[in-house]
């Protein structure tokens, strides 16, 4: 037996030990504890706005912290900043590469970022003296496509990539200050904790990992999905997070319990999940699916509480505003819809 086989066997044994230890700690289930809580009832949301302007599939969107402006990225090679109240376009930014897969709005509202198959995270300054939008930095260093990016502040951004790593960048210098390694498949999505000291990532190795931004360490690894994790989102209090996967389930993982608490699935749902987001309270989990719908789940009871149907193609991205008053969905049908 080769040394490699021995190590593989050892790793399997350790994994089983961890699984048993987690089982021993699981003295209760979330569904048992929440039996006395009233169900949320039927959630019916209406389309309040449709944002028309992109000419091709929308791949990503992100709300600004003002809960009014949002940025969207499409394969028409444009980044559009929208005013969701009026549906006006505040900026339409032509991109150097049209193969964009992610976009992000800085908390300050001064910058937006995007990236994709060019392996570069491009930072755009929205508040230049001349009033035009221009590239302020191009962050190159990943050796695979950029799948997700999120600003910590105006000078720091975290990115995830197909090259199996995440990275923290100093935007001023254009350098990676920390590289987060440990995944064994494309990293598809990341989500910052409310205090921005931690972030979680979901990958094609079917695992989610919790990282310490400052130390560059992987704190915890969460398994359970049976296929690629496409989407990940922190619970509003920062103690848990949800994932969406190609295995047609969403799952809730708890950082303190170090394990999965809940699975959100239905026999009728057989397609993958592209995006997940929590309501402001965390009671509702919204998930976008390949079957053109967005399902609303009762996060505590795992019941389907509603569905947002209105797109004519895959729902590729969604986001809830910081004030919790609206949700936006973006789709391959080239439209964004605002619901509440």
Swiss-Prot record:
Coiled coil: none annotated. The gene is GNB1. The keyword Acetylation applies. Guanine nucleotide-binding proteins (G proteins) are involved as a modulator or transducer in various transmembrane signaling systems. The beta and gamma chains are required for the GTPase activity, for replacement of GDP by GTP, and for G protein-effector interaction. The modification Phosphoserine is found at residue 2. Belongs to the WD repeat G protein beta family. The modification Phosphohistidine is found at residue 266. The keyword Protein biosynthesis does not apply. WD repeats lie at residues 46-94, 95-140, 141-181, 182-223, 224-267, 268-309, 310-340. InterPro entries: G-protein_beta_WD-40_rep, Gprotein_B, Guanine_nucleotide-bd_bsu, WD40/YVTN_repeat-like_dom_sf, WD40_repeat_CS, WD40_repeat_dom_sf, WD40_rpt. It comes from Cricetulus griseus. G proteins are composed of 3 units, alpha, beta and gamma. The heterodimer formed by GNB1 and GNG2 interacts with ARHGEF5. The heterodimer formed by GNB1 and GNG2 interacts with GRK2. Forms a complex with GNAO1 and GNG3. Interacts with ARHGEF18 and RASD2. Forms complexes with TAS2R14 and G-proteins; these complexes play a role in the perception of bitterness. Component of the TAS2R14-GNAI1 complex, consisting of TAS2R14, GNAI1, GNB1 and GNG2. Component of the TAS2R14-GNAT3 complex, consisting of TAS2R14, GNAT3, GNB1 and GNG2. Keywords: Acetylation, Phosphoprotein, Repeat, Transducer, WD repeat. GO terms for biological process: signal transduction. Signal peptide: none annotated. Pfam families: WD40_Gbeta. The modification N-acetylserine is found at residue 2. This is Guanine nucleotide-binding protein G(I)/G(S)/G(T) subunit beta-1. It comes from the Eukaryota. Phosphorylation at His-266 by NDKB contributes to G protein activation by increasing the high energetic phosphate transfer onto GDP.
């Amino acid at each position: 037996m080769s040394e490699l086989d021995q190590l593989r066997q050892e790793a399997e044994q350790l994994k089983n030990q961890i699984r048993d230890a987690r089982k021993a700690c699981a003295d209760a289930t979330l569904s048992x504890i929440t039996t006395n809580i009233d169900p949320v009832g039927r959630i019916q949301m209406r389309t309040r706005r449709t944002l028309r302007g992109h000419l091709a599939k929308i791949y990503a969107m992100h709300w600004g912290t003002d809960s009014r402006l949002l940025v969207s990225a499409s394969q028409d090679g444009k980044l559009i900043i929208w005013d969701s109240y009026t549906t006006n376009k505040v900026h339409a930014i032509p991109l150097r590469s049209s193969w964009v897969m992610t976009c992000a709005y800085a908390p300050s509202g001064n910058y937006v970022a995007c990236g994709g198959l060019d392996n570069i995270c491009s930072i755009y300054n929205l508040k230049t003296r001349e009033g035009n939008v221009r590239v302020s930095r191009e962050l190159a260093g990943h050796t695979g496509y950029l799948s997700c990016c999120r600003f910590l502040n105006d000078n720091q951004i975290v990115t995830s990539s197909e090259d199996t790593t995440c990275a923290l960048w100093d935007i001023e210098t254009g350098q990676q200050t920390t590289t987060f390694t440990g995944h064994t498949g494309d990293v598809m999505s990341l989500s910052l904790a409310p205090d921005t000291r931690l972030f979680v990532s979901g990958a094609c190795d079917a695992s989610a990992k919790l990282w310490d931004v400052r130390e560059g360490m992987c704190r915890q690894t969460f398994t359970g999905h049976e296929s690629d994790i496409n989407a990940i989102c922190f619970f509003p209090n920062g103690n848990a997070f949800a994932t969406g996967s190609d295995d047609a389930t969403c799952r809730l993982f708890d950082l303190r319990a170090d394990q999965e608490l809940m699975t959100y699935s239905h026999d009728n749902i057989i397609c993958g999940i592209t995006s997940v987001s929590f309501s402001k309270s965390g009671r509702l989990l919204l998930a976008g699916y390949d079957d053109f719908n967005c399902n609303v789940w009762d996060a505590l009871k795992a019941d389907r509480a509603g569905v947002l149907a209105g797109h004519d193609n895959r729902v590729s991205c969604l986001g809830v505003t910081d004030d919790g008053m609206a949700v936006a969905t973006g789709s391959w049908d080239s439209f964004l819809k605002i619901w509440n």
